[in-house]
Structure formats: C-alpha cells, structure tokens
Amino acid sequence: MNIDVWIKNITQLVTVQAHGKPKKGKEMQDVGIIQDGWIAVAGDRIVGIGSGEISADFQVGENTVIISGEGKTVTPGLIDPHTHLVHAGSRENELALKLKGVPYLEILKQGGGILSTVNATKKATMEELVAQSKKSLDRMLSYGVTTVEIKSGYGLELEAEIKQLEAIHRLQQQTPMDLVSTFMGAHAIPKEYKENPEEFIDLIIEEMLPAIKEKNLAEFCDVFCEEGVFSVDQTRRILEAARSLGFKNKIHADEIVPLGGAELAAELQTISAEHLMAASETGLKMMAESNVVPVALPGTSFNLATGKYADARKMIEYGLPVALATDYNPGSCPTENIQLIMSIGCLYLKMTPEEVISAVTINAAAAIDRTQEIGSIEVGKKADITIFDAPNLYYIPYHFGVNHVDTVLKSGKIVVEKGNVI
C-alpha cells in the first residue's frame, strides 16, 4: 500500500489503544506505549503502526511526507470536550475585584460576571464573534487539540443563542479542527425571568429546542444543574425534551453543592456530566453503572482558587472513565491551554501522567461520543496525531507552562509545524 505520511523513529509512541471504548478506572493507566515506533497514514486514516522497521506492506514513495519522531513523544490528537469558546469581550477587570475579596454575586449585581458576557455577546456582530473565537481555536490547535466541543449559553434568548451556534458552524469552515456544537440555553436564568423561571424553561422547551433542531445547529443539549440556577426537576424536563427531539444529553452537575446532578446524569444516561466537585459517592457510583463520562475541569478550580477539586481518584476507584477539559470561558477559566490542564490534573487531582493522557484523548472522545473515530492511535481511525518535543509522556505535565507541541496532523494533513499553526 502506498502511504501519504510516515512518522518514523518515534522515541515514545503513546497509542492509548482502546478498541472503540473509553478507559475506565485502572484501565486509564494503560496507554499502550511503543518504543521506537512508527505510524503509516493513507488519506485521512491511520493504516499501520509498529516498532522498529516499517512493515513491507507499506510503500514509501517520493510523495510520502516523512516526519522524524526522534526525541519526540507522539500521542493521539488531543480533545477538549468542554468549552464556552464562542463569546465576545473579556472580564480581566474582575481579577482585581476577586483579589480584593468581592464575592461573585456582588460582581453580578454590578453588571459583571456571566451577565456582562451575555451583553457583550448579544451586541457583537457575527464577524466580531467569529474573529475573536478563531484566535482561540488557533491557540488550542497550537497546543495539540484537534477536536473541541463548544457550547452556546451566552445568549439566553433564541436569536442570540442561534447566533452563537451559527458562529460555530462558520468557524468550522475556517479551521481544520472538528468542532462539536452544544446548545446550552439553560446556562443561567435571565434577570427578566428571575421571578418566574418556569416561563423561561417553557421558552427553552417550546421554542428554542425545536428551532435549533430545525436548523440542525447542535448535536448536544447541556443544562447547568445547580442550586439557584436549574433544579434537578427543571433539568430533567429540559433534557428529556431535548432527547425527544434527537439531541444527546450533557449536564453541568454538582459544581458547588451536592444537588443530585450526578444521580440525574445516571438516571438519564447522559453522555457526560461535568464539574462534579460536590458530587456524592452514590451519584458517582450510579454514573459508573450507567456509563456516564465524568468531565473534570481543574482549571476552573485553579482559577477560582477555592481549593476544591473534583475527586478524580475516587472516580477512578469507582471505575469511571475520567475526562479532562479546559472549560475555556471568559469568567471562571480563561485559558485555551490543555497542556496546563494536564499539569493541574497531575498536581491537584493526583492523576498519573498516563491517566491524564487517557483523560484528554480516548475518554475525552467518549465525552463527545466519538470513540469510534478519534482518541487513540489505531488502524482505521482518523489520523489525528500530536507530536510533542518531549522525550516521554511524563515530561509534558512535568515541564508546565510552556507549549511542547512540535507538529500536529489533522485527518492526515500537517496543520501545525514547528509549533506554529499553518
């Protein structure tokens, strides 16, 4: 077989082979390392992997792109399964307020917090929204991310939510990355509905969800299930309505108080449940039985400086397939750097480097229902490959705060070279 790309002499090839399934519990430690490895790519697919000399089955021709992996660590393309990337404006002024001890609710009363992002996003033109978001996507790509999930939720009304989701579709035409759209109109309750939140929930169910489905603008529906936002019963109503229309379910669950979001995720068998810092042991065990992927967002805990992180060790003990994501947003986690999240995962969630690699590849793929296509280096899978200028996988989270990416392939094409987006 003639091949288009040959990555040879790979010092450490981290395949994360999983046969189309997430890695649960102790399985996360097994990342399928091959020393002195090679990868053969034809078209947009991986057609061969091995160690030492390339198999005689593959023909390296004059048009084959040859990449040296000497001194490098090669992993599946990284996946960021939870972001709020499409938004306008920024909130750096809140850092000084936070340092002075001003509570978030007080910032909200002053017109800051999520409401300032909602207002900025509503005012922004489509062109402004796309231009700002494209910069963030390019940063993510430079850090080795080849697939990213993006939520709406800074509109909180039909027209503005549609604008965010349409921006995601425009961005897909401008990036080689795969973008996964999530409708999150239930991100907060608008101030005009504070006295009657049920009216807003009716609006989501009766108007927003059908309109977004008709335009085919989102694959997933997500709800912020939290005290003072959407109750368990309200969340159930929205997610069941979304599922009846064909949306897959996600849930922001038990971030601040143990409300029962993890239990609801298990009951509804959502694809994933995110945050989970306050999730009960019962809820986590139920999630394990229902094959729900927990998505930990340690960058948010780090930035909020609360000292409270999701209990990843307990999740792994219960046999859950832990995923990690940036939660990139302008308020609680303004970073596109998935490598930093990997370091925080090791240092604060006490995950091993192997577990962290599983969490940003195959388990992140499971959190967006993509394990058959991406998340591991296996024959037949999409050739999404990240090459790090690092001698082994341990070096990536160990040497934190810098970008270790040398080269990124997306669907078999080089899209980052020498650390720069092409």
From Swiss-Prot:
Q: Which organism is it from?
A: Alkaliphilus oremlandii (strain OhILAs) (Clostridium oremlandii (strain OhILAs))
Q: Which InterPro entries match?
A: Amidohydro-rel, HutI, Metal-dep_hydrolase_composite, Metal_Hydrolase
Q: What does this protein do?
A: Catalyzes the hydrolytic cleavage of the carbon-nitrogen bond in imidazolone-5-propanoate to yield N-formimidoyl-L-glutamate. It is the third step in the universal histidine degradation pathway.
Q: How is the cofactor bound?
A: Binds 1 zinc or iron ion per subunit.
UniProt-listed Enzyme Commission number(s): 3.5.2.7
**Can you tell which superkingdom this protein's organism belongs to?**
Bacteria
Q: Where does 4-imidazolone-5-propanoate bind?
A: R91, Y154, H187, E255, S332
Output one GO BP term.
L-histidine catabolic process to glutamate and formamide
The cofactors named for this UniProt entry are: Zn(2+); Fe(3+)
- Its chief place of residence is cytoplasm
For the ligand (N-formimidoyl-L-glutamate), the binding residues are Y154, N329, G331
Q: Kindly name one Pfam family recorded for this protein.
A: Amidohydro_1
Query: Which residues take part in binding Fe(3+)?
Result: H82, H84, H252, D327
Residues that hold Zn(2+) according to the record: H82, H84, H252, D327
Instruction: State the GO CC annotations.
Output: cytoplasm
Catalysed reactions listed for this entry: 4-imidazolone-5-propanoate + H2O = N-formimidoyl-L-glutamate
Q: Mind listing the UniProt keywords for this protein, alphabetically?
A: Cytoplasm, Histidine metabolism, Hydrolase, Iron, Metal-binding, Zinc
- This chain's protein is named Imidazolonepropionase
Q: Where in the cell is it found?
A: Cytoplasm
According to its UniProt record, in which pathway does this protein act? Answer: Amino-acid degradation; L-histidine degradation into L-glutamate; N-formimidoyl-L-glutamate from L-histidine: step 3/3
Q: Which family does it belong to?
A: Belongs to the metallo-dependent hydrolases superfamily. HutI family.
| GO MF annotations in UniProt | imidazolonepropionase activity; iron ion binding; zinc ion binding
